[in-house]
UniProtKB/Swiss-Prot annotation:
Gene name as annotated: hflD
Gene Ontology cellular-component terms listed: cytoplasm; plasma membrane
Subcellular location: Cytoplasm; Cell inner membrane
Keyword check for Membrane: yes
Protein family: Belongs to the HflD family.
Membrane disposition: Peripheral membrane protein
Lineage: Bacteria, Pseudomonadati, Pseudomonadota, Gammaproteobacteria, Vibrionales
Any one Pfam family match given in the protein's UniProt record, by short name: DUF489
Protein name: High frequency lysogenization protein HflD homolog
Length: 205
């Protein structure tokens, strides 16, 4: 896959979309369904033709691109988004250093792909299956990502499954970010360029 500013922006928007949806689910118990479907599809799309192919079309990443442009700021909400992104990227670094875990993750995702022959992607059972991949393979590598929200919402099993499935999608995009040459310096020194690229993509939707 190409290592261009466009590719890095798309991959980073994928991370942003997953964490923006985590925030929505944790607070309200529901989220943007189209964006959620895109993020779930991204987990299973392991052999894309190009970077955008992981997600579908640019418009499918609208929420993530908007979050990239406006959602990462010093407000409490923005600080929470930033914390989730940093935590996911740290977890991805630990995960990719473990070939055993990466191999197990690949096997479990292939199994989940086969399960879509019997279940719709957004069915509770399928979301539960994706959540269990995160819980069994990714989470034990640590550090644990602390999700904050409305306690009564987060106590509901279906919402816990959605959050974990979304964190798995965030990991998928963090792996993609690294595959297209994304580095920490791009976040520190190159974020303005990614924001400008995201604004261009949003303007043509």
């Amino acid at each position: 896959m190409a290592n261009t500013l466009y590719d890095r922006t798309i991959a980073f928007a994928g991370i942003c979309q997953a964490v923006a949806l985590v925030q929505q689910v944790a607070r309200n118990g529901h989220c943007d369904q189209d964006a959620f479907e895109t993020s779930m599809n991204a987990i299973l799309n392991t052999n894309p033709a190009n970077t955008i192919g992981v997600f579908g079309r640019e418009a499918d990443l609208k929420l993530g691109l908007e979050c990239l442009v406006k959602g990462i700021d010093s407000t409490p909400s923005g600080s929470e988004i930033t914390r989730y992104i940093i935590s996911l990227m740290a977890l991805e670094r630990k995960l990719t250093a473990r070939t055993d875990a990466m191999s197990q993750l690949g096997d479990r995702i292939q199994m989940a792909k086969r399960q879509t022959e019997h279940f719709e992607l957004l069915e509770d059972q399928m979301i539960s299956n994706l959540a269990s991949i995160y819980l069994d393979v990714v989470s034990p590598i640590g550090p644990r990502i602390q999700v904050t929200g409305t306690p009564s919402v987060l106590q509901q099993t279906a919402n816990q499954h959605k959050v974990r499935a979304l964190l798995l999608s965030g990991i998928r995009s963090a792996v993609l970010w690294r595959q297209v040459g994304g580095k920490r310096r791009h976040l520190i020194f190159g974020r303005k360029k990614m924001v400008e690229q995201a604004q261009i993509l949003l303007a043509r939707m």
